[in-house]
Structures are given as structure tokens and as C-alpha cells.
């Protein structure tokens, strides 16, 4: 049985989170491809949909193809290399997913105002986006709160967490925000922390509101 040091185990856990974020991003792209095959909104020449489709679709985005080779290599290095992977690799991947988070948020909001967008397209994007949102914000809160700090909860506190705090508590708190219908489990200590918690809460309330409206609309059409 392979035994890992605490720092090596922490890197493996973080790489697992980033890999799951990549898979959720790929799921969003698959749903867009499915809509294109069904001749829905993708082929109706709306610039915002086409731009997002090009950003997400594997055939149009070389970074997605590159990930097919890079991610397995990172896993092999993380599992079998004695040295730790450079921190910049994780931060670079995390920054890409933060960009993806913003693109997805804008896309979901714009999509609701486009009459050609089918209800399954919007609802499917929301379903794929919510777990991505939870994990991406959990990673961001953990990274900022623990970066260069002697102990966690110097920038952001987690109301329901118990000592000792670890990365899981940030993902758990992010998920609870969705389960509790937008009630934030984070509290900012510094101005940066307060700003992040505010942005997180506003984005979450927006996504939950869109999901509720779209789900209600689908139920009305079924009745």
C-alpha cells in the first residue's frame, strides 16, 4: 500500500477537485453538443450562444484537447513522483476554472432572455453549472484563506466548521449554501473576505432564482 506524506496527500486531493471541475465543464459542453444535434438554439446564430459553444466545445477549444494529455500526466506525477508538484500548476488550472465560472454565469443569465433557447438547454446548463459553482467557489475560498496564512480562517470564517479546519470544510460550506437556499456558510473577516462572500452570495441567489423560474416554467408547460 502506497503511503503519502500529508503535503502529498493534500496535493492529490486538490488535483481530484480540479479534475472533477474539468469533468463538469466537459458535461456542460456535452449538453451543448446535444442541443446542437437537436437543432435547438446553437444553430440559431445568437452570438452569445455560439461564442460560449466555441469556448466549451472540444473540437473548437485546443485547451480541452490538451487537458486529455496533461491531466493523466499530472496524476502520474502526483501519485508516483517523490517531489511535490509546483504550486503554480494548481493555481494556473484553478484560474482557468475561475474564468470558466464567470463565462458560465454570464451565459446562463443571458440564455434566459433568448427566445430561441429551449427550456431543456437552460435547465441542463444550470444542473451542470451548480456543482461546478459549488466546487469552484470552495476551491477559491480555501485557496485565498489558506494562501500564505499560518492558520485558516484569517480571511474567511466558516460558521459550521470545527477545528482543525481543512479543505473539505470549504467545499462543505459551499455546498451547504446551495442546500440552504442561498444562506451563506462563509463570513468575511477582512475586506477581501467580505467582498468574496458578497460576490458568492449574489451569484448563488441569481443562479437559484433562474433555476426556480425555469423549473416552474417547465412544470407549467407539462400541465
Kindly give the residue locations of the regions a language model identified.
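Pore-domain transmembrane helices of cation channels
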Residues: 106-149
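Membrane-proximal soluble regions of multi-pass membrane proteins
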Residues: 146-190
Amino acid at each position: 500500500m502506497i503511503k503519502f506524506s500529508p503535503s502529498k496527500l493534500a496535493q492529490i486531493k486538490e488535483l481530484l477537485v480540479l479534475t472533477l471541475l474539468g469533468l463538469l465543464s466537459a458535461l456542460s459542453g456535452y449538453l451543448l453538443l446535444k442541443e446542437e444535434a437537436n437543432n435547438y438554439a446553437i444553430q440559431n446564430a445568437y452570438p452569445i450562444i455560439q461564442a460560449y459553444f466555441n469556448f466549451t466545445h472540444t473540437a473548437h477549444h485546443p485547451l480541452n484537447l490538451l487537458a486529455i494529455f496533461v491531466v493523466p500526466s499530472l496524476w502520474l506525477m502526483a501519485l508516483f513522483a517523490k517531489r511535490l508538484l509546483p504550486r503554480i500548476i494548481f493555481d494556473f488550472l484553478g484560474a482557468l476554472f475561475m474564468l470558466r465560472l464567470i463565462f458560465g454565469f454570464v451565459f446562463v443569465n443571458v440564455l434566459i432572455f433568448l427566445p430561441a433557447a429551449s427550456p431543456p438547454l437552460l435547465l441542463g446548463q444550470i444542473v451542470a453549472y451548480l456543482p461546478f459553482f459549488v466546487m469552484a467557489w470552495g476551491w477559491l475560498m480555501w485557496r485565498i484563506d489558506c494562501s500564505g496564512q499560518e492558520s485558516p480562517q484569517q480571511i474567511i470564517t466558516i460558521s459550521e466548521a470545527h477545528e482543525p479546519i481543512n479543505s473539505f470544510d470549504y467545499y462543505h460550506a459551499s455546498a451547504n449554501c446551495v442546500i440552504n437556499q442561498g444562506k451563506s456558510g462563509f463570513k468575511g473577516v477582512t475586506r477581501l473576505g467580505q467582498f468574496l462572500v458578497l460576490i458568492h452570495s449574489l451569484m448563488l441567489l441569481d443562479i437559484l432564482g433562474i433555476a426556480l423560474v425555469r423549473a416552474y416554467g417547465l412544470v407549467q408547460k407539462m400541465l
